[in-house]
């Protein structure tokens, strides 16, 4: 992990227990991470920005909106922030469900600081990779939109793996006219 990635990332901790929030904040900040804590899923949704890189350390069972309900809401909003679930009451079915729904990890309490920090590092690396890939994809889309309609047709043929002659035949043009 680069120091730049770590300094830009924010680890969000959402847990209804203030002692747990303070404890995890102390451990995570002690390793040089930026940390924001939230007492509930609703507070997280109201105050957090999905545009800031990092990850979410999330308790499964909380009053009001549960961690699993928050995961579902984030998915509906298109928020791709990696989630690390922590639970004292989790079971295999719950862990499998959260992972199938996109969670990065599911840790059972008690969790060692080393295990949590390892999960955070992996999640933040994945988030950085996703954000880089998304930015590159958006640049490619923007470049494609700047092409003329005919150039877009040719580019689509190339993307489909067609040969120049095949593209020319499909578009009823000379292969020489666009190569």
For every predicted segment, state its role.
Residues 62:
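Receiver (REC) domain active-site loop signature in two-component systems and cognate sites
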Residues 12, 51-57:
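Active-site beta3 strand of CheY-like receiver
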Residues 59, 87:
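Active-site residues of response regulator receiver
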Residues 39-40, 65-70:
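Acidic catalytic/metal-coordinating carboxylates
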Residues 178-179:
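Conserved small/polar residues in nucleotide/adenosyl-binding loops
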Residues 91-93, 107, 111-120, 166:
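C-terminal output helix
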């Amino acid at each position: 992990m680069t120091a730049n990635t770590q300094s830009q990332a924010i680890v969000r901790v959402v847990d209804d227990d203030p002692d747990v929030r303070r404890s995890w904040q102390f451990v995570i900040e002690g390793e040089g991470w930026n940390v924001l804590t939230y007492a509930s899923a609703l507070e997280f949704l109201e105050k957090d920005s999905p545009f800031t890189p990092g990850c979410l350390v999330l308790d499964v069972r909380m009053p009001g909106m549960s961690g699993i309900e928050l995961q579902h809401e984030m998915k509906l909003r298109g928020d791709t922030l990696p989630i690390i679930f922590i639970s004292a009451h989790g079971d295999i079915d719950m862990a499998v469900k959260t992972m199938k729904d996109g969670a990065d990890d599911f840790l059972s309490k008690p969790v060692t600081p080393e295990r949590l920090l390892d999960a955070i590092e992996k999640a933040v690396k994945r988030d950085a990779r996703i954000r880089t890939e998304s930015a590159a994809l958006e640049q490619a889309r923007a470049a494609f939109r700047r092409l003329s309609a005919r150039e877009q047709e040719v580019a689509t043929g190339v993307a489909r793996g067609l040969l120049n002659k095949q593209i020319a035949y499909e578009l009823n043009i000379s292969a020489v006219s666009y190569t």
